[in-house]
Amino acid sequence: MVGWGVAVLCLWVSCGAAAGQLEYSVPEETERGVAVGNLSADLRLPAAAMSSRNFRFLSSHRELYFGVDLPSGNLVVREPADREQLCRAKAACVLTYDLVLEDPLELHKIRIHVLDTNDNSPLFPAGDVQLHIPEFLTPGARFALPNAQDDDEGSNGILSYSLSPSQHFRLDMGSRVDGSEYPELVLEKALDREQRATHLLVLTARDGGLPARSGDAQVTIIVVDTNDNAPVFERSVYRTKVPETAPNGTVLFRVQALDPDEGSNGEVQYSLSNSTQAELRHRFHVHPKSGEVQVAASLGPPETLLEAYIEARDEGVFGLASTAKLLVEVTDVNDHAPELDFLTLSNPVPEDAAPGTVIALFSVKDEDLDSNGRVICGMSSAGPFQLTASFDNYYSLLIDGPLDREQISEYQVLITASDSGSPPLSTRRTITVSVADVNDNTPSFPQPQQELFIAENNGPGASLGRVFAQDPDLGKNGLVSYELLDVISEGPSASSLVAVESSSGAITAKTSFDFEQLRGFHFQVEGRDGGIPPRSATVTINLFVVDRNDNYPVILFPLPRNCSVPVEIVPRSARTGHLVTKVVAEDADSGSNAWLSYHISRASDSSLFRISANIGELRTARLVLPTDAVKQRVVVVVRDHGDPPLSSSVTLGVLLSNSVPQLLPDFEDVWEPGGQLSAQNLYLVIALACISFLFLGCLLFFVCTKLHQSPGCCAQSCCRSTEDLRYGRKMVSNPCMTSATIDVTTVERLSQTYLYRASLGLGSDNNSLLLRGEYNAADLRNLATGVGLNLPISCIQIRNRKGDHANVNAMPRQPNPDWRYSASLRAGMHSSVHLEEAGILRAGPGGPDQQWPTVSSATPEPEAGEVSPPVGAGVNSNSWTFKYGPGNPKQSGPGELPDKFIIPGSPAIISIRQEPANSQIDKSDFITFGKKEETKKKKKKKKGNKTQEKKEKGNSTTDNSDQ
């Protein structure tokens, strides 16, 4: 609002003795602080006096719109006053206040008139107006419109109404009973909803203020529809083509009829008209809402024209309808694929069939017409085939090139027949052409030569390898059999050495190969197929024998002479590195199996000597000291590098002397300085003594039990048969002969075995000697007599390799009392070649292997080759035994005697062999030469030689552990 200025109109002032009344006027919405009038002047009272007289300004209104400014005495506006809020629906708006003054008391009434201003525009309380007028009304129809309201009074109120221009409506004013007016809408022209469904008008109300204010209301006139229009199709005739194979549900048309009416008057439903023939009504289906015409049944043969009528009707109260014509032309489609009919088919086809050979003959046909029935045939194949047209709709499949079953054994021929329709239809047929085999391929080996390797000492039947020839032919034409062909010009034939399995080609050995005798040979194997005629090929087999470590090193130098230890003399003044001797050895094996190294395994003084590991030179490792013993003993082991390694040893005696003695001393007792046993040997002697005493106790108990059960038996009736598992021979043993036995065995070098077993019965004059071997009767008789056995003739039996038995008369003979072990014999018994980590002993080169006995401290039960020495040999039989460890000794050649054995009264050496671990020969026997009386005599000498026997026991134990 615009401020009017401060205009105070004093209408009148009524002064009385006690009260007065003042009136003021102010326009509404006057701003704060504006002076309405000067109370001080109107009351004729100074402004300062008002304050001194306790001036008070009272009002009955909640809000104080006016107040008194004491310094100036003016009546001012505190809050703008809105007349429409303070005095709604009142012609005059007056605010009354009370002014109280004291001393003297005075009361004044103040009336303030709030004057109206044109600050409000006309307003339609209902807002926009919406009228529904049916289109069928005639002009002149009247429709009341709402009044507008204006809060202002007097000329600021509403004075007039106006309507926006329209060709269908005009505005008119109606009057009420109270004289008030209201606007009316009058229809000037008939309405058509299909042309214009909605009319928008603006009703405006204006007041009389300065400046004038106005308010608008939008009048929306909606024309209400009536069913005055029938549906109209887009086209009067619908024409289409449909294939004869159209399935049910195929949409032929989508017709549409338009109805400009609204609502249900304009909703159209479709159906077949009654004008359609009854026989066609079941072939079509019309959707009532969408107007789709679908196929409901078969339309009949091609080239048929079907005519039907469709009706569109609205849903008004009085439904209006219209019709359209449907023309459906049934057309032919390519709905038949070509058919193939095979008249002949040759399968399989031989791979040598000539080009031009007919494989198949077939015909094609198509039930469709015109281009849909024209058929074109084609072929797709990677093979040598050709498709040709014989005559109308007949085709032949021919061979167009060579066939090879080994490259391709089967062909897949794809024949395609296509018509000329749109789209074309085709039929495919795959023919499998198998190629029959003919024998046109020769067996072939992967290589013309093949190398095979076999380790020596193989067993007969060992697999050497396998040959394999490939033949791509089929069946018997590709079945290869193998045959051995001899091509060895010298030596044994290949057929005597190897065999070839005809079906698998496996090559096996017929014999055991020895690398040292046969290092390799070659032969041929022929592979032949089973075709007609057969084809064959050969392969050369080069067989190599691989060496095994089966030969022990053989010491060539130094060699024991006369069964004594070889002795070397070293001056005491020898310097360090003095050459004592050189050990020379050889090995029949090859490669690393023959690579020898030399080591000192034992020495009387290990610090005095050293040996070259490669060349075997034994040298002094330091200067000879005066305290060094004169007699030194060194055991040199020669070991190869096989897997496992084999070794041999030689015992050397070294005499530390500046002069050459006339008689060499005995080195048998030289092992430890000062003649003392090492702690290890001492433990071994104690263990052997305990075991020996335990064994003797068990043996005595067993003998007593046997004597108690069998007081006597004859030599022949008490014999029983046992089996020698190693050699497969039977021998006869007498259970009564448990007191003493001697077993002397030489293991075969190739296949010969010699076993001598003698048994002497306890407490009986009838003794038996059971020997096995290939000796004549005289030799066996001499042997039995020589060993001092008193045997009856009836108990001497001989069994040769053929299994024949014979009895030999044996004359008893006493042993030679002069036969003793000499010092050289004892020394020779300690010079041996042994297998590493075993107790098998061998002789020097060129001679058969031997197993030398060692001396133990007691006479335990013999185990695996332990035997007692002969009585009268110079050693008490109850104090030591010959003993050697287990092993696999080499075997003697056929016809060979045991290497060495002792005959009483002769310097020869007995070679005592170990029986195999699994041998069933009774191991509980031990050797006693002579009679019991001689044994008793020897026992008397035991006490006198007690000190010497202990020394021999210690040396024997030391030798045994070394061996």
UniProtKB/Swiss-Prot annotation:
InterPro entries: Cadherin-like_dom (IPR002126), Cadherin-like_sf (IPR015919), Cadherin_C (IPR032455), Cadherin_CBD (IPR031904), Cadherin_CS (IPR020894), Cadherin_N (IPR013164), Protocadherin/Cadherin-CA (IPR050174). Glycans are attached at residues 38, 248, 274, 562. GO terms for biological process: cell adhesion; homophilic cell adhesion via plasma membrane adhesion molecules; nervous system development. Its main location: membrane. Residues 19-683 are extracellular. It is a single-pass type I membrane protein. One of its GO terms (molecular function) is calcium ion binding. The chain crosses the membrane at residues 684-704. Residues 812-907 are annotated as: 4 X 4 AA repeats of P-X-X-P. Keywords: Calcium, Cell adhesion, Cell membrane, Glycoprotein, Membrane, Repeat, Signal, Transmembrane, Transmembrane helix. One of its GO terms (cellular component) is plasma membrane. It comes from the Eukaryota. Residues 844-902, 914-963 are annotated as: Disordered. Residues 705-963 are cytoplasmic. Residues 1-18 form the signal peptide. Potential calcium-dependent cell-adhesion protein. May be involved in the establishment and maintenance of specific neuronal connections in the brain. This is Protocadherin alpha-C1. The lineage of its organism: Eukaryota, Metazoa, Chordata, Craniata, Vertebrata.
